[in-house]
């Protein structure tokens, strides 16, 4: 089993770049919310999760719940949706559950560790998913992470006065 060890020097965080996994997961939830918002569908599915609005479309939901128009982290919207079982049906894979749980409880996540933990679980005990599913999910996350990191704007103008 191959493992990758990443050693960071903190340069990105020292310059307030949103490069933590928590930032990435918030971006992921934001993509889902934006897809719903501009879509007439009431279902979203990928290999990590499935979200369904039971009674209306996302546009109707956003219109009737003005709080969604007030900016706040997307993971807060998703948390509200997960808690509203009357109007929403949410299914997360164990991998995404572990990632979100780690962020919620510790304020950070090590995605590679979560993957490795579940991979060991697949090997040593019967689970409702196979290692192939887990590998597909990790590959999806990697693809999404590349897209996310490519979208981060690192060039910004800093006024000269800032350096005086």
Residue ranges with predicted function:
Residues 2-12:
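Short, hydrophobic/glycine-enriched beta-strand segments
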Residues 12-18:
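Short N-terminal binding/cap micro-motifs at the start of the first secondary-structure element
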Residues 18-28:
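Short secondary-structure boundary/capping segments
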Residues 23, 33-164:
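Active-site periphery "cap/insert" segments of enzyme catalytic domains
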């Amino acid at each position: 089993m191959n493992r990758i060890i990443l050693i960071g020097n903190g340069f990105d965080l020292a310059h307030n770049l949103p490069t933590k996994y928590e930032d990435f997961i918030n971006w992921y939830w934001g993509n889902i919310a934006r897809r719903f918002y501009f879509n007439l569908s009431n279902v979203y599915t990928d290999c990590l999760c499935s979200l369904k609005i039971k009674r209306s479309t996302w546009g109707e939901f956003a219109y009737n719940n003005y709080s969604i128009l007030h900016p706040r982290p997307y993971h807060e919207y998703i948390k509200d949706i997960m808690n509203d079982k009357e109007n929403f049906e949410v299914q997360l894979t164990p991998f995404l559950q572990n990632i979100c749980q780690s962020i919620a409880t510790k304020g950070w996540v090590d995605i590679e560790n979560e993957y490795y933990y579940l991979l060991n679980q697949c090997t040593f005990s019967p689970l409702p998913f196979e290692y192939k599913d887990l590998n597909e999910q990790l590959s999806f996350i990697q693809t999404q992470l590349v897209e996310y990191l490519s979208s981060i704007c690192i060039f910004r103008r800093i006024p000269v006065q800032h350096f005086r």
